[in-house]
């Protein structure tokens, strides 16, 4: 009878899936769902599967309320967040929960590895700890139940933890470690060296930590970057306040702290210089690029958002497609919205005879250093240039 009750409880679980949930910060996502859900719930085993965020709940009323939350939350891009709820068996961390005796042994082992003076916990190569192996206890931190048990003990026994060493544990993903932001939020040093992490994307799962020191050497992800600067830049995207990476001091991060209550003053249009140059630049802007078309591009290399990919597809017959093309923006700039910072210019005026001395004319050679390269304009002139550089007469044979 008791076993039947346990089996029934194992079946009373619901899986909650948020498509493209990987785009959102875990804390923001869960707080948004909790605040919009009419029934309080406790998420269990939060993790990511490809680009989806998933967790489990056991209460049927909470599952029903979560269905009602779907499409009621908007992200920063004003896109609705979809939530799917389905019946499921108990999550892995619940079905394979450590027994009380195993939890007690794990706690004793972690106590031995804790440095009180430095508030540091050394869990490197934990699976092969002699005390655990002597009692046939397998603590494999890649398994969510083992990582969940470890974080639970950490929260209860080491609330002031500052340094955590997870070196050499064959970690290939950090789903189980994502709860560290709630269980041990004060951690400043994290050692993940000599593991199996293949992508810096995994670090996004623990980016809620305010890390000052991080170790990643010995992971496959370290060889995926073209150079050291690209490596440092990618890691700092997750941890902006990082000071040391793999034991090396990093330059102090540049952090611009602007009070959100202050409104930045608008840029005032100003032009000083030759009116001739102003006219030439204006002509250049009228004909130079087609930036307005970029937002409607269907180039997969440019457009990554799946929502926009679906939104921009046109499932119509030929006449409708023509209508779609006619709806594209015209190739015309809004000149009132354009500000040009001309920081480099060279002007040469040269003498180029055509048929003979009677047809000698002056030409103005204008070189503009633009953002994507050097642009050269050659224009007829009635005489030597009045622009800053002296005229250079050149005779063609």
From Swiss-Prot:
It comes from the Eukaryota. LRR repeats lie at residues 160-185, 186-209, 210-237, 238-265. InterPro entries: Leu-rich_rpt, LRR_dom_sf, NTF2-like_dom_sf, NTF2_dom, Nucleotide-bd_a/b_plait_sf, NXF_fam, RBD_domain_sf, Tap_RNA-bd. Pfam families: LRR_NXF1-5, NXF_NTF2, Tap-RNA_bind. Keywords: Cytoplasm, Leucine-rich repeat, mRNA transport, Nucleus, Repeat, RNA-binding, Transport. Residues 13-92 form the RRM domain. Transmembrane segments: none annotated. SUPFAM superfamilies: L domain-like, NTF2-like, RNA-binding domain, RBD. It is found in: Cytoplasm; Nucleus. GO terms for biological process: mRNA export from nucleus; poly(A)+ mRNA export from nucleus; RNA transport. GO terms for cellular component: cytoplasm; nuclear RNA export factor complex; nucleus. Residues 280-367 form the NTF2 domain. One of its GO terms (molecular function) is RNA binding. Could be involved in the export of mRNA from the nucleus to the cytoplasm. Could also have a role in polarized cytoplasmic transport and localization of mRNA in neurons. PANTHER family: NUCLEAR RNA EXPORT FACTOR, NUCLEAR RNA EXPORT FACTOR 5. Belongs to the NXF family. It is linked to A chromosomal aberration involving NXF5 has been observed in one patient with a syndromic form of intellectual disability and short stature. Pericentric inversion inv(X)(p21.1;q22) that interrupts NXF5. The NTF2 domain heterodimerizes with NXT1 and NXT2. The RNA-binding domain is a non-canonical RNP-type domain. Interacts with NXT1 and NXT2. This is Nuclear RNA export factor 5. The gene is NXF5.
């Amino acid at each position: 009878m008791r076993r039947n009750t346990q089996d029934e409880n194992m079946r009373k679980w619901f899986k909650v899936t948020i498509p493209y949930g990987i785009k959102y910060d875990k804390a923001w996502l869960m707080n948004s769902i909790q605040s919009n859900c009419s029934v309080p719930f406790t998420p269990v085993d939060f993790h990511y599967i490809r680009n989806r965020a998933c967790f489990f709940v056991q209460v049927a009323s909470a599952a029903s309320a979560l269905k009602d939350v779907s499409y009621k939350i908007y992200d920063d891009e004003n896109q609705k967040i979809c939530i799917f709820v389905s019946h499921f068996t108990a999550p892995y961390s619940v079905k394979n929960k450590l027994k009380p005796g195993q939890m007690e042994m794990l706690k004793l082992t972690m106590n031995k590895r804790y440095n009180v003076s430095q508030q540091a916990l050394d869990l490197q190569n934990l699976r092969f700890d002699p005390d655990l192996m002597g009692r046939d206890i397998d603590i494999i931190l890649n398994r969510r139940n083992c990582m969940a048990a470890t974080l639970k003990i950490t929260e209860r026994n080491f609330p002031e933890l500052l340094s955590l060493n997870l070196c050499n544990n064959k970690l290939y993903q950090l789903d189980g470690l994502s709860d560290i932001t709630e269980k041990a939020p004060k951690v400043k040093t994290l050692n993940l060296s000599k593991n199996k992490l293949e992508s810096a994307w995994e670090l996004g799962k623990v980016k809620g930590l305010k890390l000052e020191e991080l170790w990643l050497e010995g992971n496959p992800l370290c060889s995926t970057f073209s150079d050291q600067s690209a490596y440092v830049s990618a890691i700092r995207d997750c941890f902006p306040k990082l000071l040391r990476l793999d034991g090396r001091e990093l330059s102090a991060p540049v952090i611009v702290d602007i009070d959100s209550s202050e409104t930045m003053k608008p840029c005032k249009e100003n032009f000083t210089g030759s009116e001739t140059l102003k006219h030439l630049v204006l002509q250049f802007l009228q004909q130079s690029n087609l930036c307005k078309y970029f937002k409607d591009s269907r180039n997969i290399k440019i457009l990554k958002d799946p929502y926009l990919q679906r939104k921009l597809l046109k499932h119509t017959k030929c006449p409708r497609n023509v209508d779609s093309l006619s709806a594209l923006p015209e190739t015309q700039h809004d000149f009132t919205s354009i500000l040009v910072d001309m920081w480099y210019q060279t002007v040469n005026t040269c003498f180029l005879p055509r048929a003979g001395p009677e047809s000698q004319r002056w030409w103005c050679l204008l070189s503009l250093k633009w953002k994507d390269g050097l642009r050269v304009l050659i224009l007829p002139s009635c005489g030597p240039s009045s622009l800053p550089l002296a005229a250079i007469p050149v005779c063609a044979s």
